[in-house]
């Protein structure tokens, strides 16, 4: 799935105008949900400071802001997970307070989390009605009635799934549909969706958006949290922006463009999202010839020069990540040749790859990158700890000094190196993981979805860092599902489709149309 850093506004929708300077939208329609002067603090941190938010019935409100802006905290307050320190919540015009998520759900507010909360070994029907099972005259669970109600619910939402299918057999997108059906089954008037498209394909996104449009037509109020601006302009009626725990303002989506939205989010104008770079003139550092992994990808060939950024584009399942993992020795190739620094090499495991000068920032930092219960320093030192150990001792002072230097260079925002890394924002977690690999002094840096799930301000910092590393002679392979990112950062773009390399485009000839044409399985003639 390809996202976008900037996008064109959609056609105008019939909505009252919003404000652009922190006020409230015009009261031409009754509000479904109103948040007034809400504040929330944690030890040493003010997460929300006197914020407001209003949701109209039959509308999609996109909620945007950098990581740490307070979006998630406010949503957890609305959903009954946290209780506010001050302020008021009004639902359908009446003051409400929620002690638990169940009380919010019963009142008509449902939150669909980014990490889905379903039971994999239970059926769709059982997941939807868990805790609310229909009973027959004998006070036993009436499975037939549950099946009938689930089938009706899925049909109404145009979700083509069997109520008896086990949730564990469903794709991520299908599980999201089940979560939506479950929320609707509570007759929820307000649905909160947190990054719902972060791990689904372009086709699945289109299906999700059609369901959201149906819910909007039914009068539901939808709060849609996302970092992807193209989604905002495609699906949202209004956009609310938070920054540093404060409400910045609300605008109609069709009155904004990408630049004005970025300015609201970061508090400054980002005149250039992607830094300017000159085409490198370094020597070939890595040469890959007909690299293959049986059943996954075949005959992948390319050269990578020192100081070059090679982008790899393709739809999900195209084999991009598999190529990266093979180069790093996670899944050794079945055939083909890899030449590094002029010599043929056989990379059998990641340890060999690191010794040669390879580094890999993996696709899913939470699953394969972070040690969430460890500190920032413990996460950063993982790849170089052996270099500072000897005779049963670790050179803690020197190791700490290097970690501090990397934090300064990469602008990792953390109260201390002892801070648990799981408490940092997504952007700072990603920079800490990048610091881990830069401490190994790699010659080839492989970045798999380096800006996934981080805000636009952190993205700009990552882009500038990549450009700086390339200018210093590091060779970079960057895999990304965001097409503007690939085109904006790469000197050349390699495009893959179902395990096959479809072509390599030079920066001067690469366009969204050409890349999508190749990614869809069509050769450029």
Curated annotation (Swiss-Prot):
<protein>
    <recommendedName>
        <fullName>Putative ribose/galactose/methyl galactoside import ATP-binding protein</fullName>
        <ecNumber>7.5.2.11</ecNumber>
        <ecNumber>7.5.2.7</ecNumber>
    </recommendedName>
</protein>
<dbReference type="GO" id="GO:0016887">
    <property type="term" value="F:ATP hydrolysis activity"/>
</dbReference>
<feature type="domain" description="ABC transporter 1">
    <location>
        <begin position="33"/>
        <end position="269"/>
    </location>
</feature>
<feature type="compositionally biased region" description="Polar residues">
    <location>
        <begin position="1"/>
        <end position="15"/>
    </location>
</feature>
<dbReference type="InterPro" id="IPR027417">
    <property type="entry name" value="P-loop_NTPase"/>
</dbReference>
<keyword id="KW-0547">Nucleotide-binding</keyword>
<keyword id="KW-0472">Membrane</keyword>
<comment type="similarity">
    <text>Belongs to the ABC transporter superfamily. Carbohydrate importer 2 (CUT2) (TC 3.A.1.2) family.</text>
</comment>
<keyword id="KW-0762">Sugar transport</keyword>
<keyword id="KW-0997">Cell inner membrane</keyword>
<dbReference type="InterPro" id="IPR003439">
    <property type="entry name" value="ABC_transporter-like_ATP-bd"/>
</dbReference>
<comment type="function">
    <text>Part of an ABC transporter complex involved in carbohydrate import. Could be involved in ribose, galactose and/or methyl galactoside import. Responsible for energy coupling to the transport system.</text>
</comment>
<feature type="binding site">
    <location>
        <begin position="65"/>
        <end position="72"/>
    </location>
    <ligand>
        <name>ATP</name>
    </ligand>
</feature>
<dbReference type="GO" id="GO:0015611">
    <property type="term" value="F:ABC-type D-ribose transporter activity"/>
</dbReference>
<keyword id="KW-0677">Repeat</keyword>
<feature type="domain" description="ABC transporter 2">
    <location>
        <begin position="279"/>
        <end position="523"/>
    </location>
</feature>
<dbReference type="InterPro" id="IPR003593">
    <property type="entry name" value="AAA+_ATPase"/>
</dbReference>
<dbReference type="GO" id="GO:0005524">
    <property type="term" value="F:ATP binding"/>
</dbReference>
<dbReference type="InterPro" id="IPR050107">
    <property type="entry name" value="ABC_carbohydrate_import_ATPase"/>
</dbReference>
<keyword id="KW-0067">ATP-binding</keyword>
<dbReference type="InterPro" id="IPR017871">
    <property type="entry name" value="ABC_transporter-like_CS"/>
</dbReference>
<keyword id="KW-0813">Transport</keyword>
<keyword id="KW-1278">Translocase</keyword>
<keyword id="KW-1003">Cell membrane</keyword>
<dbReference type="GO" id="GO:0005886">
    <property type="term" value="C:plasma membrane"/>
</dbReference>
<dbReference type="Pfam" id="PF00005">
    <property type="entry name" value="ABC_tran"/>
</dbReference>
<feature type="region of interest" description="Disordered">
    <location>
        <begin position="1"/>
        <end position="23"/>
    </location>
</feature>
